[in-house]
Amino acid sequence: MTERSPLRVGIGGPVGSGKTALTLNLCRALRNKYNMAVVTNDIYTKEDSNFLTRNEAMTPDRIVGVETGGCPHTAIREDASINLAAIDDLCEKFDGLELIIIESGGDNLAATFSPELSDLTLYVIDVAGGEKIPRKGGPGITKSDLLIINKTDLAPMVGANLDVMEQDAKRMRGEKPFLFSNMKTEDGLTQIIEFIEKQGLFKA
């Protein structure tokens, strides 16, 4: 019987939307449940992987930071080889790996993951970007497996109407799921985990 490949969950979204905070929360919630690892993408630094290591998301050997150079979307879409190589290394290092989170570098709304890199794609936008963000569309908003509208606590400060964002998200995504979250308070985290487990067939 062939060993099952790990589920690869891609987390994308613009700079500052809360991707790394989501990755950290997922690691803390799932690291004792699944054999898992993380690959982060940054243009010229390893800031996100260093942040996860400093905050003890997992043991440092399970967190790999890749420096993409140039446009971050190239490393998750047009030429995913640097990420695929990092995944291969992790699979060799940790036998029976079940889950790998791939966090993209911050990019625009047009960035998406290559199907060869990610089995399941979560796309994170934030309320601070304004209530118009969902209606702007783009592959991340319309085609991701789960759209996460983060930082709901900032809505009153930026004058964003969550009801408008909800209606626009429904219109842009059709039947595809989305949810509101606040990664600072872990609001919405349980639903995100349930989605990953159900779609990744960890749970019947």
Swiss-Prot record:
Keyword Chaperone in annotation = yes
Membrane-spanning regions, if any? none
Assigned keywords, A-Z: Chaperone, Cytoplasm, GTP-binding, Nickel insertion, Nucleotide-binding
Supply one GO molecular-function term: nickel cation binding
Subcellular location, principal: cytoplasm
Q: Where in the cell is it found?
A: Cytoplasm
Top-level taxonomic group: Bacteria
| Annotated Gene Ontology cellular component terms | cytoplasm
Q: Which SUPFAM superfamilies match?
A: P-loop containing nucleoside triphosphate hydrolases
Q: Which InterPro entries match?
A: CobW/HypB/UreG_nucleotide-bd, P-loop_NTPase, UreG
Q: Which GO terms are recorded in the biological process aspect for this UniProt protein?
A: urea catabolic process
Record-annotated residues binding GTP? G13, P14, V15, G16, S17, G18, K19, T20
Q: Which residues form a coiled coil?
A: none
Which HAMAP family does its entry note? Answer: UreG
Say which family it is in: Belongs to the SIMIBI class G3E GTPase family. UreG subfamily.
* Alphabetized PANTHER family for the sequence: UREASE ACCESSORY PROTEIN G
According to the record's subunit comment, the protein's assembly and interactions are: Homodimer. UreD, UreF and UreG form a complex that acts as a GTP-hydrolysis-dependent molecular chaperone, activating the urease apoprotein by helping to assemble the nickel containing metallocenter of UreC. The UreE protein probably delivers the nickel.
Q: Tell me, what does this protein do in biology?
A: Facilitates the functional incorporation of the urease nickel metallocenter. This process requires GTP hydrolysis, probably effectuated by UreG.
* Name of the protein in question: Urease accessory protein UreG
Taxonomic path: Bacteria, Pseudomonadati, Pseudomonadota, Gammaproteobacteria, Moraxellales
**Designated gene of the protein:** ureG
